[in-house]
Amino acid sequence: MLYSFYKVFCLKDYVFKKARIFVKENKLKANIVFPESSDSRVLKAAIVILQKNLADSIILIGKKDTVINSLKEFSNCNDILGRIEVVDPNSFPDIEMYLDEYWSLQKLKGVTKQSLKTQVLDEITFAMLMVRFGYAKSCVCGAVSTSAKVLSNALRIIPKLEGVKIISSFMIMDTLCTARNVDFCFGHNGILFFADCSVVVNPNSLELAEIALQSAKSFKDILNAKPKVALLSFSTKGSSSAKETEKVKNALNIVRNKESDLLIDGELQLDSAIIKDVAEKKCRESLVAGSANVLIFPNLDAGNIGYKLVERFAFAKAYGPFLQGFSKPISDLSRGCSVDEIVFASALMISI
């Protein structure tokens, strides 16, 4: 059998192009705040982002002299220094306004405004407030800070989208990140979204339904393509019965009642969801089975293990996790992230 070996879709090029278009059309809004300027990966990424015109400007949180001196250690940054703003929370002119806002958000009896000032001066908290006030379009962090710190600050400060009850996350899996046999191309041009992989530990039916709806929206917003959502399980269409499968079935009914036009099905085993030959045998009438591009896992164990299996054994490129459900784009990086991964996450935050 002859196979076709070529790259049909480059996710990185696609996202970079979208980011550049946004920058061109929305210059004053196309900026990112990086609160972790002490990390050399963040500084290198900031330089690359500006040189590739993936953002109009960058805000770095820290002591101005320290940050500028660190930047100047990279010989290739002189041409973009004018597009970098270094902000020190301790000398920020609107710090009292930020403190007032943060205090109003806490809703804690007996807590004085001044007692919260140390928290507001924290780089992550301060950066989230900058996004809330519209000083920056997006906050990209997590290279140094834990996911718990990033998420807790975002939950306190960044409003949710209207109607959203829970925040969740998704991974973008690029299964065609290198030249491969395109006769076995999964998802949308080799791209699949996995959710939830990092936030909601054991979602109930309502939460699972919301994760599915949010992930479908994220897929459509990012790729401008039609989502086909599979609610995964160890069972396909009643092949096994347990409380775990009932949770998935209930989630399916909730989604269909809320958004009847969405292509979604469940419960589906993984092979039924993505392999057409298997889908033909197990669930021929399904409009999703065999061609799903958004995979919703029943719990965090399955989602987290699942994406890492695909990344390590299938050599897919894993981007994320990306938070969804917030009204502002927030990215929680892995502490093991590379410069390239920071650049990609930043471009994605600008493009949406």
UniProtKB/Swiss-Prot annotation:
Pathways per UniProt: Metabolic intermediate biosynthesis; acetyl-CoA biosynthesis; acetyl-CoA from acetate: step 2/2
UniProt-listed GO biological process terms: acetyl-CoA biosynthetic process
Assigned keywords, A-Z: Acyltransferase, Cytoplasm, Transferase
Cellular component terms per the entry's GO annotation: cytoplasm
Coiled coil, from the record: none
GO molecular-function term, one example from the UniProt record: phosphate acetyltransferase activity
Keyword Acyltransferase: yes
Cell compartments where the protein resides: Cytoplasm
Catalytic activity: acetyl-CoA + phosphate = acetyl phosphate + CoA
The enzyme's E.C. designation: 2.3.1.8
Domain of life, source organism: Bacteria
Family the UniProt entry places it in: Belongs to the phosphate acetyltransferase and butyryltransferase family.
NCBIfam families in the cross-refs: PRK09653.1, pta
Name of the protein this chain belongs to: Phosphate acetyltransferase
Organism, scientific name: Borreliella burgdorferi (strain ATCC 35210 / DSM 4680 / CIP 102532 / B31)
Gene it is expressed from: pta
